[in-house]
Regions:
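Rossmann-fold dinucleotide-binding core
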Residues: 1-52
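An accessory alpha-helical subdomain
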Residues: 55-171
């Protein structure tokens, strides 16, 4: 945008879908561009309506959206496609399910309530997203190979490695 428009520029990415009816507690990622003070009225308005402003560079935004959006969409898209291929009776499975399964199916259901063009665009928007999805698929394949080999030790090692990484974060 900066090279195509000489005036004020700001990157604004609402982190919610079109069905949200209120800005309250919703996140807006803001990437400063040029003459940022020009947009202070807009950011203040979002804050007044209860929105949360998170500032980052465009580079950080793009790098993290690979994981926040693209790989998550692919993972849930894959699970939805698998459930459809397997013709799982979702109503019956939900009767027999854990709370975690219910939450996951709810998330998958929300994904498939969206516009398919938007979902696909989110996954294919950049080469970095496509490459990350390929790496995720490679991880799935590597772990599936351990399952196929009934390699308990290998699976536990993979679990503990991920567990150690994730446990270092305080949410």
């Amino acid at each position: 945008m900066l090279e195509y428009h000489q005036g004020p520029v700001i990157g604004l990415h609402p982190m919610f879908g079109p069905k949200v009816e209120s800005f309250s507690e919703q996140k807006f990622v803001v990437c400063p561009g040029r003459n940022d003070e020009t947009f202070e009225w807009l950011l203040n308005w979002i804050r007044i309506l209860g929105g949360n402003i998170i500032v980052c560079t465009p580079e950080e935004h793009d790098r993290l959206m690979v994981f926040v959006q693209a790989t998550q969409h692919f993972s849930r898209f894959s699970l939805g496609a698998f459930v459809a291929e397997e013709e799982v009776d979702l109503n019956r499975s939900l009767l027999l399910s854990t709370p975690n399964y219910q939450q996951e199916i709810d998330i998958v259901k929300r994904l498939f309530a969206q516009n398919p063009q938007l979902c696909v665009e989110i996954m294919l928007a950049t080469e970095e997203r496509c490459q990350a999805i390929a790496r995720l698929a490679s991880t799935y394949n590597r772990l599936a190979q351990l399952v196929a080999q009934k390699d308990r030790f290998g699976l536990i090692q993979e679990f503990e490695k991920a567990q150690e990484f994730i446990s270092n974060f305080r949410f």
